Amino acid sequence: MAKKNRLNTTQRKTLRQKEDEYIENLKTKIDEYDPKITKAKFFKDLPISDPTLKGLRESSFIKLTEIQADSIPVSLQGHDVLAAAKTGSGKTLAFLVPVIEKLYREKWTEFDGLGALIISPTRELAMQIYEVLTKIGSHTSFSAGLVIGGKDVKFELERISRINILIGTPGRILQHLDQAVGLNTSNLQMLVLDEADRCLDMGFKKTLDAIVSTLSPSRQTLLFSATQSQSVADLARLSLTDYKTVGTHDVMDGSVNKEASTPETLQQFYIEVPLADKLDILFSFIKSHLKCKMIVFLSSSKQVHFVYETFRKMQPGISLMHLHGRQKQRARTETLDKFNRAQQVCLFATDVVARGIDFPAVDWVVQVDCPEDVDTYIHRVGRCARYGKKGKSLIMLTPQEQEAFLKRLNARKIEPGKLNIKQSKKKSIKPQLQSLLFKDPELKYLGQKAFISYVRSIYVQKDKQVFKFDELPTEEFAYSLGLPGAPKIKMKGMKTIEQAKERKNAPRQLAFLSKANEDGEVIEDKSKQPRTKYDKMFERKNQTILSEHYLNITKAQAQEDEDDDFISVKRKDHEINEAELPALTLPTSRRAQKKALSKKASLASKGNASKLIFDDEGEAHPVYELEDEEEFHKRGDAEVQKTEFLTKESAVMADIDNIDKQVAKEKKQEKKRKRLEAMRREMEAAMEEEISGDEEEGKTVAYLGTGNLSDDMSDGDMSDSEGHLKKKARTVDYSHGHNPSNSVDDDIIEVEEPQTLEDLESLTAKLIQG
């Protein structure tokens, strides 16, 4: 085997100097690069390092897309970026390349901790980003980690302290920030939010705020999505004030022009379908497109499960798959891999795969249920027609949804064409569904759950002009699922759909008057008021009635007394002592005594307490005094005073809030420091135990010295097994003059190693005698 050449100190120093010069030249090129003057078309035209270029070239990334050419130079120069682009335009590379280049220019190592944090709203998108990063960063020395739900937390905790680039979902990242001792974000260089509008919405608001509060404020932030948010409040939460807006959308007057939200190669269609006929149309569509690769979006995981199981039993003639958020992570990953490899397949899915996932060669995207807004529509149809390829989309709209939702699409310059259904191609599957649900109780249960989940999804939608809950044909929809009737649904504060409609249409005043008595007064329900232990004590009943067991005992004693005397004296006559009269006022029982000593009862008898404060002159004043009206008006208008007071108090509360955040951050850091200290002590204790164990083992074995220090030291390097098991004849060389330098011709005594005390004594005697 060839010997590996090691560089000496001079060579290593020269290599470091060359690397420093290369990085400085790279920084100079980045500062001098102006994307307005020279717009790059290829990755090699950008000022990026050779290892990154090599990884891109090996992964077949040669030509830049529009979003990459616009955003990468700005990100390389260190600006915060708010980027919006079409779906399938290469946004992942647009933020991964700046992340790698930033850490490369900073000479980042595993000892520097976490350098970049990439947050994704879904597990599948996080996995896709991680795979792309490992491909293009294969020639760099950075460590990357993926943390998502469904994986082993302990396995991630053991390794997360050595990660340079961390990719994950918000919930799992926050969990590691709270629990991982070695995860330090104080030196973070870059924060990236993929599908930023989804990460910033109400679903992830608290989680994302908690993550951002632990990060360094000097970081660089990149936000990427196909539908971008420019809300000032959202951007302020991320400390994003001086940022650059780039992308394919033209920014005019602070608003994004959404003219090119969907790819130009995408053909968009819609059909008007009654709710009860949706499954018939879907099954007919699948039967007529057996040679295609399609994704069918439904609103809930229960619907996905029901449609998949029923269609699978009816065998439409194409491979069927299903994917939703309630599946295990392994099943979701396997389904994605199978769908990517297949060419003729139908995938039933929820919005868990609506964003960012790169599915190859998808022909059709079918939306059975209307999306909650236009942004969701854009992300759904973006699963096809990616990277300039052709694709088609179809959305099914009920007559109640059609007019309002098409207006919202037209407002975003999206105009889908209308398709008419051929009656010859339409096939009713209602009898088959009824037969399947009658034979299989599990399918019937799934159908009921699918019905309930769809109705609830309509009920909770915000856009009431599109989603009209009162006009839902529930009986017809239940019949179309194969159910005998509409199941009863419990809403928040409403037992059934009928009660919900009745309560919605009922007059409010009539409902208020129904609680009034004959005099027209509304009686409050005292049963809902809290009851104290004193209330419960005085509400006790039948306290004078004794138990049956006690009555039986007293009855037997009374019979014994009657047998002795006919008349018995209970008490002799006596005189009342006036000195004993005050004792009659004392409590007669412990309960009465406890009540007399109760602070609550005594305070109730005294009335409400009044707190006073004293001024400098010693006069008492109530804590809250009403100001004179004339003095109040002297200070100005009431609305102006109100605004000034709110502004002043808001500033005070903001300062207190910042202090509270700093205290919470310091407590969290102190908690981590204590964990690290405890781990260090455990490691030191383990090392001390090992050392003490080795010393004790060394004391149990005694060696006979040779008089030569070097020989003794070499003998001490033996392993424990050699010292205990090997029993060789030991040669002891002692000269007459006790000089080790004498010749070897002097007297030599060969003896075996002593085994017992007698052997040792005989050997000592021989040595003394010479």
UniProtKB/Swiss-Prot annotation:
Q: Where is this motif: Q motif?
A: 41-69
Gene3D superfamilies recorded? P-loop containing nucleotide triphosphate hydrolases
In residue numbers, the region (Disordered) covers: 705-747
Q: Which GO terms describe its biological process?
A: rRNA processing
- Could you say which residues bind ATP here? A85, K86, T87, G88, S89, G90, K91, T92
Q: Name one cellular component (GO) term.
A: nucleolus
Which EC numbers does the record give?
Answer: 3.6.4.13
Q: Which domain of life is it from?
A: Eukaryota
Name all Helicase C-terminal domain ranges.
278-437
Q: Which UniProt keywords apply?
A: ATP-binding, Helicase, Hydrolase, Nucleotide-binding, Nucleus, Phosphoprotein, Ribosome biogenesis, RNA-binding, rRNA processing
Q: What is its main location?
A: nucleus
UniProt family annotation? Belongs to the DEAD box helicase family. DDX10/DBP4 subfamily.
Please give the PANTHER family that the UniProt record associates with this protein. RNA HELICASE
Comment field on protein domains: The Q motif is unique to and characteristic of the DEAD box family of RNA helicases and controls ATP binding and hydrolysis.
Name recorded for this polypeptide = ATP-dependent RNA helicase DBP4
